[in-house]
């Protein structure tokens, strides 16, 4: 309701201004014809009125800005009112084999204040160095699953176990430190390529390590062409880089962290299939102990995955390799056919 009246404020102000001018000009014409008012007096009256009306327009714009600021302030207050997260509370310690890194059993998750769960009864496991693919349509639960894996939301019951060298994390802070995450919509910050790559790192890194991460992310070639190389300028929002270049730089930043888990959430969507294939092969060859979780809309991206989760309406519809799903899942075949024109 507030937004409705705010949107009407400016056009209503201009309507009143122009309507008033029209009335004055019409009445002035009548007064001049009756020799009650001179032409000079009419022009002076219009000029004075315009000055007043211009300030009224400014006042209307100020009121609109204040209204928007008030709404934004209320939202910020809601964020500050949230209870702080306790990321240092100890989690239950568990052990597993060195190969086992992720185990999900009957995962169910419901967003706060939501009536229905977004994820229901999802189970799978993952071994060290494997590639896990996740695919599904809009509303299938891909984003919800990622947010739970990242520790941003708790599951409805304890159903996710994360391991590193056979041991589970001590607390939520350590849980999150084990995961590098790259979203589809990536952000670069004003500075240099070096400052963007090392953003958030707690340890010093060498130029050799920076170039290695760029090479894995298939970003070395275009960075080598930049004036200043690693110290080349990055404009705010990465405006001087294409979408694919920004995605590759963000992947290089995640690779540099050397976390045991790497999640690429549709983070190669702006890359062509050849570059994408080279990038995924480079991750597998150069980071053999890193477990990669790959969310994508393209079946071609997931063909090298050790297993693929096919989600639909928050449930696990099918699981297996690309070849297995092509044989066993009609839904997966339809997704593949819609992208390639045939069921291959």
Which ranges hold each PLM region?
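Membrane-water interface of transmembrane alpha-helices in multipass transporters/channels
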Residues: 34-47
């Amino acid at each position: 309701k507030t937004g409705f009246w705010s949107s009407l404020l400016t056009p209503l102000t201009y309507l009143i201004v122009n309507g008033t001018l029209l009335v004055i000009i019409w009445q002035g014409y009548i007064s001049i014809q009756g020799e009650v008012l001179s032409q000079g007096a009419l022009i002076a009256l219009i000029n004075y009125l315009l000055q007043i009306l211009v300030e009224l327009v400014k006042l209307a714009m100020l009121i609109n800005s204040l209204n928007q600021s008030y709404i934004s302030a209320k939202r910020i207050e809601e964020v500050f009112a949230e209870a702080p997260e306790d990321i240092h509370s100890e989690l239950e310690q568990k052990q597993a084999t060195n190969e086992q890194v992720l185990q999900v059993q009957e995962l169910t998750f419901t967003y706060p204040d939501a009536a229905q769960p977004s994820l229901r009864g999802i189970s799978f496991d993952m071994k060290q160095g494997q590639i896990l693919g996740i695919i599904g349509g809009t509303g299938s639960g891909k984003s919800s699953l990622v947010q739970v894996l990242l520790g941003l939301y708790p599951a409805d019951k304890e159903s996710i176990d994360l391991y590193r060298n056979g041991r589970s994390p001590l607390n939520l802070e350590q849980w999150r430190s084990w995961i590098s995450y790259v979203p589809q919509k990536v952000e670069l910050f004003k500075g240099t390529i070096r400052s963007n790559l090392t953003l958030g790192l707690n340890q010093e890194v060498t130029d050799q390590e920076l170039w290695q991460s760029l090479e894995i992310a298939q970003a070395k070639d275009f960075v080598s062409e930049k004036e200043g190389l690693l110290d080349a300028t990055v404009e705010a929002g990465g405006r001087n880089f294409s979408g694919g270049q920004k995605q590759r730089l963000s992947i290089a930043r995640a690779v540099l962290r050397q976390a045991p888990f790497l999640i690429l959430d549709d983070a190669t969507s702006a890359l062509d299939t050849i570059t994408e294939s080279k990038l995924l092969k480079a991750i597998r060859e150069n980071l053999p102990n890193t477990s990669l979780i790959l969310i994508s809309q393209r079946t071609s991206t997931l063909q090298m995955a050790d297993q693929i989760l096919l989600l639909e309406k928050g449930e696990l519809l099918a699981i297996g390799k690309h070849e297995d799903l092509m044989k066993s899942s009609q839904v997966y075949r339809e997704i593949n056919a819609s992208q390639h024109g045939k069921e291959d």
